[in-house]
């Protein structure tokens, strides 16, 4: 019986272009908050000023569910939030995660070994692969930062630059590329006043008349 050639086996796997899937654990490893911390933040920081009586009642019910130890996603499923209340929840969610995301980015400027994903991608691209697909449910941009540290071009559905517009993959050409598919949206995705979807990089607050396009847990993600 011949001895298994692990190097050849690994090369065969790489040749099949495996998909990398990133869940919340990938972000938690860098100190990003999970659902429990987000739930606490929402209760304490969501702006509920000016809501209607019905919206306020829904908010109180939502907060009580969280205090009763119902998890965030289940709590959001058990209430019917209006478009306005949902917008407030999205804004608070964006504010918290964007701040933590920025902290990780600043740390990465001082430590070029902070992202294990960079090493994985660099290793995978030592094969004949030209494109690697990454699928993530996370709003943060840690996958993008990891690509940058590894000198790997990445595509998230938009053109390059600071103010980015929707683009097909064929519009972005490079010798090798990581496609990052963000199924719940991203911190830098917004609906503009023209009602088109754009991406704006590394901002500390949501611009006036722009709406974050992250999809919070609960019924919103089915819309």
Regions found by a protein language model. Name each.
Residues 1-223:
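Conserved catalytic-core helix/loop/strand module for nucleotide-ribose chemistry
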């Amino acid at each position: 019986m011949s001895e298994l050639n692990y190097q050849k086996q690994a090369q065969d796997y790489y040749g099949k272009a495996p998909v990398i899937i990133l869940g919340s654990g990938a972000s938690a490893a860098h100190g990003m908050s999970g659902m429990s911390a987000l739930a606490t933040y929402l209760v304490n920081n969501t702006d509920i000023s000016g809501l209607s009586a019905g919206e306020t009642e829904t908010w109180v019910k939502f907060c009580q569910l969280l205090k009763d130890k119902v998890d965030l996603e289940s709590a959001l499923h058990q209430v019917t939030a209006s478009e306005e209340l949902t917008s407030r929840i999205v804004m608070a969610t964006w504010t918290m995660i964007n701040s933590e995301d920025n902290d990780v980015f600043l740390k990465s400027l001082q430590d070029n070994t902070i992202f294990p994903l960079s090493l994985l991608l660099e290793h995978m691209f030592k094969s004949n692969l030209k494109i690697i697909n990454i699928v993530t449910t996370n709003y943060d941009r840690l996958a993008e930062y990891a690509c940058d540290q590894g000198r790997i071009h990445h595509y998230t559905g938009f053109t390059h630059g600071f103010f980015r517009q929707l683009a097909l993959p064929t519009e972005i050409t490079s010798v090798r590329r990581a496609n990052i598919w963000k199924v719940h949206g991203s911190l830098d995705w917004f609906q503009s006043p023209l009602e088109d979807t754009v991406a704006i990089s590394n901002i500390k607050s949501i611009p006036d008349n722009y709406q974050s396009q992250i999809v919070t847990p609960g019924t919103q993600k089915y819309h």
